[in-house]
Structures are given as C-alpha cells and as structure tokens.
Amino acid sequence: MDLSIPNPVADATRQVEGGSPAGGQPLEIDALIVGAGPVGLFQVFELGLLEIKAHVIDSLKVVGGQCVELYPDKPIYDIPAVPSCTGQELTDNLLKQIEPFEPTFHLGQEVSVVERRDDGRFFVETSLGTRFITKTIFIAAGVGSFQPRTLKVDGIDKFDGKQLFYRVKDPSRFHGRNLVIVGGGDSALDWTLDLVGKAESVVMIHRRDGFRAAPASVAKMKELCEQMEMQFLVGQISGYEEKDGVLTEIKVSGADGVTRRLPLDDLLVFFGLSPKLGPIAEWGLDLERKQIKVDTEKFQTNIPGIFAVGDINTYPGKKKLILSGFHEAALAAFGAAPYIFPEKKIHMQYTTTSPKLHKVLGVESPVFD
C-alpha cells in the first residue's frame, strides 16, 4: 500500500512557483480559483466551456485537496457513472479533463490580500508575493487549509521532521526501524497495518480502547497483537528522553496510573488534520459557522464577483458531497460570465451537439449519416 503522494499536475497545465511577472506588474486575469481539490478542478472545466481561462491557487504543494491529502488510496463510490475510484484517480481524471483549458497552478501559497478596486475587479496577493488583478474569484477551498493536530508535549517539537512525523511521504524511510504510532483513526490504523512486518517493531498507542477507524482494520490490528507481531497500549504520551539530541524513549501514562517507557527510533502521530479558514475569514464575507453563505442561483457570496463552491459554502439544504460541488461549479461559472463578458449573451450549449464546444475541447464533431 503506497500512500505517498506525487505531484499530479498534468503536463498540459502550468505550475508557477510564485512571484509576479517581470516588472512586478500583477497578472491580469478573468478568473481566480482558490482551492485545487476536485471541485476547484471541475470549476476550471465549467469556466473553460465558457471560454474563461482560470488560474488556481492552493496552500498545498500538490493538486487534489482533501482527496490526495486524506484518502489518496481509499475508494470513493458516489461519483456519477464511476462505480469506484480512489481520491488520486479522481484527481488524475479531473486533470485529464481540464487539459484543453491549460489552467495555471500556483501551489504552496495562500491568498493573503483581497481588495476591491474602483473598476470592480479585485487585487489579490498571495503569501509568496504572486499578485493578480482578476474579474472574478471562486473559493473552492474545502473547509480551509489543513494543518496536522500536533502532540502536546513540551519540547518534543524539536524532533519534527527528524524522528517525529505527522504525515508519511516515503514509507520505506521507516523500514527496519522501531516505531511508535499514536492515534485512533483510519490513518493511524492504515499505517500501522502497512508497516508491521517492514519495521523492526511497531507499538500502537491510543488514549482509549475504542477507535474511529474501519472495524476491519481494528480487527486486523488486534489479530496482529495476538500473534505477537506488534503491541497496542492504552495511554497518552506524557514525556520523552533524549541523548545527544536524539529521541530515545517516550513515556506513556496509562489509565492504570502506570507510566511506561518505550524505546523507539521514530514517532508517528496521527491525530487528524485541523481545518482552518485562515485569511478567508477576513475577506468581509458573510459567514455561518465558519462557512460562506451563498445564494443558490449562482452560488455567489455577499460580495458581487466572489463565488463559493464545495464544502466551504452553506445554504439551506446543503450537503457536503463532491457531487454537490460539481453542480455548484456549473452554476457559478454561468453566474460569473456577465462579469467577464458584460456585452455577451451566454447561450446554453451541450457538449454532445455543439461544434463550438467541440472546438474548445479540441475534439472532432461527430458526423451522423
């Protein structure tokens, strides 16, 4: 089971590392999408059908959002006409679908400034200094940027990235090592099961005997414990020991009042990811429980020209489904068109029959006898 995440930006898209063009002038664009998850990617597609080119910003360094950050190899069953696909496969297919529109990605950066200009457009600047003047903004940031929930033990953060890890990028790095894995969710169980037999030893720690993970994974973990392939302890990490700057032991306080000392090479902590709206919360948008209120005609916010699609928005009857986000992206694209083409009447066309859309998509129009 390889859960490492490659950078999946397709060849037909452009990725920009940051900074504005030569001369320091902002990029003047029609549409800026904040969030490169499935809904943000489909927003590129829907805008592309209307001949609107998009730039995409994401705080992660890879495209895919929650799908590749949380469940790249887990099956998704509720995408229409796709009986089953993984989060990574869904992302790859969406990237393939948007290739004709050649979006530009600005990864590893967050929007830090949004200002309305006198001409109705928006000035936007990112944390890396990339600047835009855009006619429309689409917020497709899921539930915000994700940060791992960290282990609250004084001083242990000094080992972060050396012997303390909150994500696994290269599983082989832990082969032959003595591991302690902490957590009670799917990520903790998945990595425990994957690394047993590859690591020198595995001890799993959770604060209680109940789990928030798939029952089959829990059963398999307990079976491995019975076979003496690994150990499981109920308790919480309360301290550690180091020697010459190297983490050598952790202290685990159990419910029985006993503190145990565990030698280790690496500590893997999976307490989940904490979603944060970040700077979006300061844009002057109407919020309800950290979600952006929108209308259901165009999924526009209280600020004309700014739209919100996917899990980050809220409206009566809202369901947090990828399917719902795709629907919202389609209507948001049509809602944005008048800001970009104020003199142009937008006609409804269908990809099955429209020669114009076939040209936009780079496909041949079918000829029927």
From Swiss-Prot:
Record Gene3D superfamilies: FAD/NAD(P)-binding domain
Region (Disordered): 1-21
First-tier enzyme category under EC: oxidoreductase
Enzyme Commission code: 1.18.1.2
Binding sites annotated in the UniProt record for FAD: 58, 66, 71, 111, 146, 311, 352
Classification via SUPFAM superfamilies: FAD/NAD(P)-binding domain
Keywords of the record: FAD, Flavoprotein, NADP, Oxidoreductase
Cofactor: FAD
Signal peptide span: none
Protein name: Ferredoxin--NADP reductase 2
